[in-house]
From Swiss-Prot:
Pathway: Amino-acid biosynthesis; L-histidine biosynthesis; L-histidine from 5-phospho-alpha-D-ribose 1-diphosphate: step 6/9. It comes from Bordetella petrii (strain ATCC BAA-461 / DSM 12804 / CCUG 43448). The lineage of its organism: Bacteria, Pseudomonadati, Pseudomonadota, Betaproteobacteria, Burkholderiales. One of its GO terms (molecular function) is imidazoleglycerol-phosphate dehydratase activity. SUPFAM superfamilies: Ribosomal protein S5 domain 2-like. This is Imidazoleglycerol-phosphate dehydratase. Keywords: Amino-acid biosynthesis, Cytoplasm, Histidine biosynthesis, Lyase. The gene is hisB.
Length: 195
């Protein structure tokens, strides 16, 4: 089983993340940011990874530090659970619709962090959630999971639908990239021999 648990404490947040990359989509989520919990649920269910996330942050200021630091800590946990990437499919992609919204996510477990992020949100907030924090979450995750990630919302009118299709597509792309390919024979999927 590819599992990891990371605890990350700063002056702004205290976060514990446990992941099982070979799970069934079970989740226990308590970040103090309800919309973030809803989006993390999409990653777990559509990625078929088990997530246990507990976060305490300076929400009396705003959700920025909590959302970003959850992304950072989740990225660290994914990187630890993936290990040396032997036998990994490495690449994953998904298109996901939700009514009028459609998003595409492509991921590469390259060892090189990079984020291309294109979501033209139709409003600035989804309930109490500042949509700018979506980028902060994924930037933190990318930097610490050491992945290249392309996120494109291709169309959408409802900002909730735009965001949800991105997180669902991320979960599905992650699931594909994390699969172990028996034809690889345990080799690392790179001509370099390492990732």
């Amino acid at each position: 089983m590819r599992t990891a648990e990371i605890t990350r404490n700063t002056n702004e947040t205290r976060i514990r993340v446990a992941v099982n990359l070979d799970g069934t989509g079970k989740q226990t989520l308590d970040t103090g940011v309800p919309f973030l919990d809803h989006m993390l649920d999409q990653i777990a269910r559509h990625g078929l990874i088990d997530l246990d996330i507990k976060a305490e942050g300076d929400l009396h200021i705003d959700a920025h530090h909590t959302v970003e630091d959850v992304g950072i800590t989740l990225g660290m946990a994914i990187a630890k659970a993936v290990g040396d990437k032997a036998g990994l499919r490495r690449y994953g992609h998904a298109y996901v619709p939700l009514d009028e919204a459609l998003s595409r996510v492509v991921i590469d477990f390259s060892g090189r962090p990079g984020l291309e992020y294109h979501i033209p949100f139709t409003r600035a907030r989804i309930g109490d959630f500042d949509v700018d924090l979506t980028r902060e979450f994924f930037q933190g995750l990318v930097n610490h999971a050491l992945v290249t990630l392309h996120i494109d919302n291709l169309r959408g009118v409802n900002a909730h639908h735009q965001c949800e299709t991105v997180f669902k597509a991320f979960g599905r792309a992650l699931r594909m990239a994390l699969e172990l390919d028996p034809r690889m024979g345990g080799a690392v999927p790179s001509t370099k021999g390492v990732l």
